[in-house]
Design a protein with these regions (language model features):
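Short, ordered loop/turn segments at secondary-structure junctions
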Residues: 12-14, 93-94, 119-122
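Short, glycine-/small-residue-rich phosphate/pyrophosphate-handling segment
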Residues: 125-153
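Proline/glycine-rich low-complexity loops and linkers
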Residues: 111, 117-129
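Conserved small/polar residues in nucleotide/adenosyl-binding loops
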Residues: 154-159
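Short acidic/histidine-rich motifs immediately flanking catalytic phosphotransfer sites
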Residues: 83-86
């Protein structure tokens, strides 16, 4: 055992896992990158955490609603009851991020930190924000003091 907390990352799609044909194009496909691919692109995570990944959905969040959020909530509850998981991070699209966060905050009563995150620009963009958001969300999920605060949300400030 490394002594580092284990964080379980659930991918649901969205811009954070989107990819375009070039770094300068505005066109991209949501949800085409796996959660494991996102983690592989973020330097430094292994210094403070062990990461497990899974992909629950792979779509734009405009296609996610209460039915999918119930499935997500059940999975979060399962994971936070596991002795092998110290926190959960969910990547989600921004179109319905607020609704998903609110829904999960109301229905989940996690005993461990749960943090949602997203991105405004796809992973392949020149100014992609998903890596920094994912880093900070995973870091937050390692903080034991966040237990009992429900489902939290992390996104970085937009550049001006």
């Amino acid at each position: 055992m490394s002594g580092k907390p284990t964080i379980h990352l659930i991918g649901t799609g969205g811009t954070i896992s989107g990819a375009g044909s070039s770094a300068t194009t505005a066109a991209y496909e949501s949800g085409c990158l796996e959660a494991s691919e996102l983690v592989a692109e973020v330097e430094g995570l292994s210094k403070f955490s062990n990461i497990q990944t899974e992909n629950l959905f792979a779509t734009g969040s405009e296609n996610l609603g209460p039915n999918q959020w119930r499935i997500l909530a059940r999975r979060i509850e399962e994971l936070t009851k596991s002795k092998n998981v110290d926190g959960v991070v969910v990547t989600h699209g921004t179109d319905t991020l607020e609704e998903a966060s609110f829904f999960l905050h109301l229905v989940c009563k996690p005993s461990k930190p749960v943090v949602l995150t997203a991105a405004m620009r796809p992973a392949t963009a020149l100014s992609a924000d998903g890596q920094a958001n994912l880093f900070q969300a995973i870091l937050a999920a390692t903080i034991p003091q966040l237990k009992g605060h429900g489902c939290l949300l992390y996104t970085s400030p937009s550049p001006r």
